[in-house]
């Protein structure tokens, strides 16, 4: 009782309340005038232009850093479309179309390097979403790691371009929430006595990775069973079935379908407008 008597209460009169309301109105007007925040965290690097296909003309692509284990260059940049060429969840027709877009000796060397990995994550890590690519023998690539994918003048937002074959929506009722969280997911399966990878861009309203991982286990129960069987009878060095990494979020209303026309080849895509990129920690699961 004594503590309650000592507690002080601030009284707000009509003038003070009106001042608070006016301050809030000014903040809202400021946000409406300048739009979404334009600050972002960028990563930049050079990479041979012969590793780039559609990425040069279409910004808003996921890029990955590939460790080469060589003295020079120590790493290269490749896109999600490059990785999709060998993913088991991509249709044969789409893989063939992508292979026609990447036809150099360096591409063959990179594919051989990727085939030697037990897990893709051993050599490949997320670099960001492209917002600028220069032209030349070696291209300077600028990627957004956190923030909206603005162009260099910060006038336009590119969003995120996703190959439709890679899209996965595991929610019971997809796109019912106003916000969709975007995840990068790798799934591994056993086929012809070897391990193959699948790469997915997952859209979900779930923010708790553990709950989403349970949904993915259920979704890929067949692949998981085959993988576990391979672990028991085969290579004991493998220790996880998949991985999940949140890469950003966007409004559900900004998810649009489209077509990407490239050198006479048409690819069905999903375009996520006004994406906020935020590369989080990767989680593995069995």
From Swiss-Prot:
GO terms for cellular component: host cell nucleus; viral capsid. It comes from the Viruses. Keywords: Capsid protein, Host nucleus, Virion. Its main location: virion. It is found in: Virion; Host nucleus. InterPro entries: Herpes_1. GO terms for molecular function: DNA binding. The keyword Hydrolase does not apply. Pfam families: Herpes_VP19C (PF03327). Signal peptide: none annotated. GO terms for biological process: viral capsid assembly. Structural component of the T=16 icosahedral capsid. The capsid is composed of pentamers and hexamers of major capsid protein/MCP, which are linked together by heterotrimers called triplexes. These triplexes are formed by a single molecule of triplex protein 1/TRX1 and two copies of triplex protein 2/TRX2. Additionally, TRX1 is required for efficient transport of TRX2 to the nucleus, which is the site of capsid assembly. Belongs to the herpesviridae TRX1 protein family. HAMAP family: HSV_TRX1. Interacts with TRX2, MCP and capsid vertex component 2/CVC2. This is Triplex capsid protein 1.
């Amino acid at each position: 009782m004594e503590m309650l008597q000592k507690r002080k209460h601030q009284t707000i009169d009509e003038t003070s309340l009106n001042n608070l309301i006016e301050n809030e109105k000014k903040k809202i007007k400021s946000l409406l005038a300048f739009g979404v925040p334009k600050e972002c965290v960028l990563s930049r690097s050079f990479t041979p232009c012969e590793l780039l296909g559609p990425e040069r003309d279409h910004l808003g692509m996921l890029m990955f850093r590939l460790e080469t284990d060589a003295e020079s260059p120590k790493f290269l940049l490749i896109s999600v479309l490059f990785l999709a060429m060998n993913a088991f969840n991509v249709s044969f027709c789409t893989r063939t179309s992508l292979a026609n877009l990447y036809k150099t000796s360096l591409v063959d060397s990179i594919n051989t390097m990727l085939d030697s990995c037990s897990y893709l994550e051993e050599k490949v890590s997320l670099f960001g979403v492209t917002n600028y690519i220069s032209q030349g023998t070696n291209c300077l690539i600028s990627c957004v790691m956190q923030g909206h994918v603005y162009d260099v003048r910060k006038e336009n937002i590119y969003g995120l371009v996703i190959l439709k074959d890679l899209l996965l929506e595991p929610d019971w009722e997809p796109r019912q929430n106003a916000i969709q969280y975007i995840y990068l997911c790798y799934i591994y399966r056993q086929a012809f006595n070897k391990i193959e990878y699948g790469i997915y861009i997952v859209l979900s309203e779930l923010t708790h990775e553990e709950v989403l991982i349970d949904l993915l286990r259920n979704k890929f129960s067949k692949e998981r069973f085959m993988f576990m069987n391979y672990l028991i009878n085969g290579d004991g060095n493998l220790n996880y079935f998949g991985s999940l990494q949140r890469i950003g979020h966007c409004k559900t209303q900004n998810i649009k379908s489209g077509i990407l026309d490239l050198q006479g080849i048409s690819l069905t895509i999903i375009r996520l407008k006004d994406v906020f990129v935020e590369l989080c920690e990767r989680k593995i699961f069995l």
